């Protein structure tokens, strides 16, 4: 019974997270340091997000800023995160954010 309850909770959480996924464009911002961080307009500060490109590269980054404030963009990532996503040459890439 306990295992069934845990499995049901995990499935429910997965469904909730999938329902809250955003799809759109990501850009990146320069500057020093920051590690794997990002800026999002509404997600609470400190939240860990998974950002996945449509090419299949994926990272986890912590929300530590607000933005982007450019139409069509849903997230700004740090230079380190942009390198990991393979987007430093293009500057903007289509992503899903969970």
For the regions a language model picked out, list residue spans one by one:
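Secreted/periplasmic proteins
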Residues: 2-98
């Amino acid at each position: 019974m306990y295992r069934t309850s845990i499995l049901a909770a995990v499935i429910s959480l997965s469904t909730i997270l999938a329902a809250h996924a955003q799809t759109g464009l990501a850009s990146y911002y320069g500057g020093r340091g920051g590690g794997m961080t990002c800026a999002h307009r509404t997600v609470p500060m400190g939240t860990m997000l998974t950002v996945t490109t449509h090419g299949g590269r994926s990272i986890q980054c912590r929300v530590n800023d607000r933005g982007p404030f450019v139409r069509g963009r849903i997230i700004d990532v740090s230079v380190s995160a942009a390198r990991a996503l393979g987007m430093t040459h293009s500057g903007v890439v289509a992503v899903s954010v969970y």
